[in-house]
């Protein structure tokens, strides 16, 4: 999980979602998991 000030989609399978007021990227590639914070 990368924590970044700005999250971006890295590949076509990445999805930007909101969870508990946090913006997150989920992907089938675990290296692409990101959270804004």
UniProtKB/Swiss-Prot annotation:
Keywords in alphabetical order: Ribonucleoprotein, Ribosomal protein
Protein origin, superkingdom: Bacteria
SUPFAM superfamilies given in the database record: Ribosomal protein L36
Entries under InterPro entries matching the protein: Ribosomal_bL36, Ribosomal_bL36_sp
GO cellular component: cytoplasm; ribonucleoprotein complex; ribosome
Pfam families documented for this protein: Ribosomal_L36
GO molecular function per UniProt: structural constituent of ribosome
GO terms (BP aspect): translation
NCBIfam families: rpmJ_bact
UniProt family annotation: Belongs to the bacterial ribosomal protein bL36 family.
HAMAP family: Ribosomal_bL36
PANTHER family: 50S RIBOSOMAL PROTEIN L36, CHLOROPLASTIC (PTHR42888), LARGE RIBOSOMAL SUBUNIT PROTEIN BL36C (PTHR42888:SF1)
UniProt-recorded name of the protein: Large ribosomal subunit protein bL36B
Gene this chain is encoded by: rpmJ2
């Amino acid at each position: 999980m990368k924590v970044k000030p700005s999250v971006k989609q890295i590949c076509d399978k990445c999805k930007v979602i909101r969870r508990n007021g946090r913006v997150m990227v989920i992907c089938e590639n675990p290296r692409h998991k990101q959270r804004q914070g």
